[in-house]
Amino acid sequence: MNLKPTILLFTILFLKCATFEVNEETERIVEDAVMRALDSRASENSESEQTSQHIIVSQQANSDSKSAQFTGEVLEEATRILVREFGLEILPAANEVIERWRNEEEELLQSSETTTTTEHPDPTRSKRSAIFRSKRQANRRCSSPPINCNNRFHTSIRSITGLCNNRQNSDLGNSVSPLRRILGAASYADGLGRIRTRSVNGGELPSARLISNRIHDDRNNQVFSPSINHLHMIIGQFIAHDVVFMPSSVARDGGALDCSACNSPQRVSPNCAPITIPRNDPYFNTPCMRLTRALNGQENFGVRSQIGQNSHFLDLSPVYGSADCEAETVRSFQEGKMLTFDDLGYTLPPQNANDSNCQSSAPFHCFTCGDFRNSLHPALIPVHTILIKEHNRLAEQVRVARPRFNDEQIFQLVRKIMIGMWQHIVYNEYIPKYLPRRTIRNFALRPLRNGVHRGYSTSVDPSISAEFAGAAFRFGHSQSRFDFPRLTENGRPAGNYDLGNDIFYADQMYLTRIGGWEPVMNGMVRMPAMKSDRYFSFGIRNQMFEIRGRNGSGVDLVSINIQRGRDMGLFPYIQYRQLVGLPTVTSFNELNTTFSQENIQALRNVYSDPADIDLYVGIMLEEPLSGGQLGPTASFMIGEQFRALKRGDRFFYESIAEGTDNFTQEEISELRNKTSLAKIICTNMDFAARINTDIFDHRSRQVACTSLPQLDIDRFLR
C-alpha cells in the first residue's frame, strides 16, 4: 500500500521492540506527562467552548462518554508531550505503564463491590487515577449488574451495556468502548489525530461540500429502486441506531460545541472541524458548515480513537437502552412491561417534554425510548412503537401463563425473546436484500435451517469497525426519499411529509384524524426507496437538522459523511481495495474494473489523484456486485461486521456457548419458523388486515395477516 510517510513511520515504530524499557524512570516520565496534561487542561479557559445558541446534536454524549472524553483528551495531550520530548519510540513502553495503572484501578473497582471504601492513600495515585473512567460511573444510582463476569447473573442475562458478554474480556462490545479498525491503523496528518487536509500531490483536498455538489446531487438522477421498499431503509437506520452511536465531542462544561464558524477550530475548540462551503453554493449562503469531531475516547497513548456509546451488539438498544439508568426510564416495572403513551387512542412511546433536540412545541412532544435519536424523523417512531407493543404483548402472555413470575423475570425473558426475533429478522430478511448470496455465504451470515451455531469464540472482537460506522453502513442514506408518503390501510394516499422539514419534529405522530403513525408505516411498506447509488435526495444533501422556515440552517449529510471519515482517520478508498481482493490502483483509468466510465470521470472532476478518494465516496460509486445492491468494498465491510456480531456474541440467538443460558434447539426452531417482521407489524397495527409477503419488496403480493405464523410463547416457558 502507498501509505503516507508519517502514518507508515508511526505503524513501524509500534511494531518494533520498544527502545524504552519499562522501569521506574519510564514510569516517572509517563507520570510527569500525564500530570502536565492534567494541569494544562485545568488551566485552560473553557469559556470559549460554551455555545451561545441552541445546537441540535444527534450524537449527544451521555455522562459516561463525557468521562471517556476527559480520559481521551488527557491521553492525547500526554501523547503529544511524550512524542515531542522523547519521540514515538517511547509509546509502547508508556502504554505498558498505563495498562498497569488501569489494571490497578479495575482491581480497586472490583473490590469496591465487597468493601465500602475506594480511597487512594497516595495523593499522587489519587490524582493519576482521575484519568481513568469508572465503568458506569454515572449510573451508580441505578441498578447495575455485577462487574465480576463469573457472577451467575452473566450466565443467564445479557447485560444492558454489553458488559461481560465476553467473559474473558469484559469490555469487548460494551457501551462506551472503542471502535476497532479493519486495517489496524489510522490515517491522520500527523499519525496521531489531526485531520488530513492535503492531497498526496501536495495541494488541498477538495472540500466535502464541493464533492457532494459535484458528485452526489440527484437533481437529474432521481431513480427509484425497482423492488426494495422504503421500510428497508428505515430498518437499516434502526439497525444503525442499535449498534452505532459515535457521540460528538463536548465543551469543557459538558455542553454542545458551536462549530459553525470557519475559525471555530482556533476560536472555539480543536474538536471543531467545519466544512468549507464553495462560493455560489446552490443552497447554503454561509462560508462554512458546522461539524463537531467525534468524541476522542482513546484509552492508550497514541492514536485518536472513536467510541460506541451504545452496546456494539444487536440487542435492541433503541428499545431497551445501552446504559442502566437509560433502561430504567423506559420500563414500567409492572408485569415486565414497557412504558407507553396512549392518550390519543393509539399507542406511542412515552412522551419526553425535556428533549433538548425536539423542535416541535407542546403538546407535540418528542418521545423517550432506549435511544434518544428515536424522534430524528417521523418514520422511526412507527418502528419503535411496534417493537414496544410486541414486547408488552408477549409480556402479557407470560404473565397469564406464569402468574408467579415477578416483573424482572417477565421483563428479562421477553427481552431475550425480542432480541432473538430481532436478530433473526436482521440476518434472515434484511441482509439478503442488499448483500449478494456469495458474500452471505463467504461470511456465513445465513441462518441455519436446523441445529445450532457453534461458531461463538471469545477471540472474535464483536466491536463495530470504524469503517462500518463511518462509511459502509451509511449507504442507506442514498435510499432515502425526499418525500415520505402516507397511505391508508387500503393503499389510498393520505398525504406525505418532507424529510427536510421534519427532522426532530414530532407533530406528524399526533395527526389523530388519519390514525397517527400507521399511515406512515403503510407508506414505507408499499412505496419504493430510492435506488442505492451515488445520488442523494435534496433533503439529505441540504436540509438535515434544518429549522422550519430557515433555509440553510441545517447541514448536508453527504458532506458530513465525507468529513466524518477524515475526522475518524479512515484511509482513502484505494487503501482498502487489496483487502477485498481488488487490484491496486495508481491511476484513474485503473478503476475501470469496479467503476463505470461515468463515475470515473466524476471522480476526475473533483480529485487530483485516485489516492485521495474518500472511502465513503469510493464505495458509493462502485458498481454493485451481481445479485446485490452494493459494490465489493462496502459488501466486504458490512459482511465482515455482521459475521463479527454473530461469532462474537455469546448470546446470539442461534448459538450454544459454554456457561450461557442460550435458547434451546426447540426455542431456536420456534424463532426461525415463526418470526417475521411482517407478522410483528400486522399484530401491532390497529388497522392492518393484509401485509406484503416479502416485507422489504414494495411489489410483493399481500396476504391476510392471520395467515402468518404466530410465535408460541409456551415454547419459551421452561
UniProtKB/Swiss-Prot annotation:
It catalyses: 2 a phenolic donor + H2O2 = 2 a phenolic radical donor + 2 H2O. Expressed in the hypodermis and gland cells of the pharynx. Specifically, there is low and transient expression from the distal bulb of the pharynx to the anterior of the buccal cavity. Whole body expression levels increase upon entry into the dauer phase. The record marks 373 as: Transition state stabilizer. Residues 45-64 have a biased composition (Polar residues). Disruption phenotype: RNAi-mediated knockdown results in reduced survival in response to infection by E.faecalis. Residues 20-146 form a propeptide. Residues 1-19 form the signal peptide. One of its GO terms (cellular component) is extracellular region. SUPFAM superfamilies: Heme-dependent peroxidases. GO terms for biological process: defense response to Gram-positive bacterium; response to oxidative stress. Its cofactor is heme b. Keywords: Calcium, Disulfide bond, Glycoprotein, Heme, Iron, Metal-binding, Oxidoreductase, Peroxidase, Secreted, Signal. It is found in: Secreted. One of its GO terms (molecular function) is heme binding. Glycans are attached at residues 354, 551, 592, 662, 673. Its main location: secreted. Residues 41-64, 108-144 are annotated as: Disordered. The active site is at 241 (proton acceptor). Heme b binds at residue 477. Residues 126-139 have a biased composition (Basic residues). Pfam families: An_peroxidase (PF03098). Belongs to the peroxidase family. This is Heme peroxidase 2.
